[in-house]
Every structure is written in C-alpha cells, then in structure tokens.
C-alpha cells in the first residue's frame, strides 16, 4: 500500500506551485503543466517522492538517529512543532539561529542557560530574588524557550534534517550541507532541488499541504520506533 494517495494530495492542494514568473527551471522535471499563470506539480512524482522520503526517515529512526524538523514560515510553524513532538524528535519553528549546527557548542551554552533559568524557576530561587531580577529572568527564559525550546534536549548533531521550504531555510540547508547531514525537504517550484538530498515536490505555502506531508514523515519515525518496541518486547 502506498504511503500517500493522489486523493489526499489533491485535497490538501499539494499540486499548486508558484506563479510561473517565480520559478526555478531546475524544478521543471516535477512540473505537470501550467494553469492560469501557476505551475501545477506532477503528483505522480510527489507520490513516489513521499514514499522515498518516508523510507529514508524510517530507516534513520530505526537506526536510532535523530531528525531535526525545520520550518519557520507561518504556514509551517504549527505542523513542525506538533509533528516533531509527536514523533519524539526536535524542531526549529521560529527563527533559525545561525550556527545552530555549525557552531553547536555555542548553541549548547545558550541551552544550558535556558535550563539553568528553568531550574531556578522550579527550585524556588525566584522566590528569594528581587522582583525586578525575576521579571528579567522570565523575559530571558521566554526568549530562549521560543528559539531553542525545540532543541533543548538535542545532545548532538542530528542524523538528518526535514525542511519545509529550503529557500526560506537556506541558512539551515547550508549548515547541514557543510556538515554532510542529509536533507529531506518539501520543495516548491521556486526552490533549487539540487541542494536537497530527498526532494518532495509540493506546495509549501498551504497549511494543509505542509501538515499532511509533515505528518507522513512523523508517521515514518513512529513506525520505526514501534518496530523497535516489537523487537525488544
């Protein structure tokens, strides 16, 4: 049975690409036709590519690898957080902080600061500190949680990146490429597919499309984890 059906893709609007004037010619092989000034993505290719990406994600998870979900555009933020959390993986859904991968040690220092403030909040330290200081610490905690909350338990570099809109997330993509971390990505008609190891040609602007595809990637991870549980049980 295939991972995803044409009907599901159509209903979520996965086939709608960008306007024809905003395209990357390298995406030509994934385009079916042009309609009213918009490129229509070839969903038969998307079905195959979702299947490929699903298998890649499942295999990485089965080997105990961690996958970092990245999507900071408005349409992706919620799905990225929800599906990464459901799969027990990590995510960045606000702003990608430069050096998140290439300067991971520095990022870890900021995560340590985040955890230190959390501990202070939990162990009663806040109760004995001046009110003004507590207000500042809470603000700092809020900011750190916003940007680093999704990776605060990530001990090392991820085994792979799942990215929504590599054009928007070009810094994350560049960092992963520099470190030879494989990238699985939802790639629209205005993106460069050559930068992505496993391309899912799809509409990256519709919330339903992003949610559908991201949930399938989370399903792949959960399938691998359930397989492990069956083996150990």
UniProtKB/Swiss-Prot annotation:
GO terms for molecular function: structural constituent of ribosome. One of its GO terms (cellular component) is cytosolic small ribosomal subunit. It comes from the Bacteria. One of its GO terms (biological process) is translation. The keyword Ribonucleoprotein applies. It comes from Bacillus cytotoxicus (strain DSM 22905 / CIP 110041 / 391-98 / NVH 391-98). The lineage of its organism: Bacteria, Bacillati, Bacillota, Bacilli, Bacillales. Gene3D superfamilies: Glucose-6-phosphate isomerase like protein, domain 1 (3.40.50.10490), Helix hairpin bin (1.10.287.610). This is Small ribosomal subunit protein uS2. Keywords: Ribonucleoprotein, Ribosomal protein. Belongs to the universal ribosomal protein uS2 family.
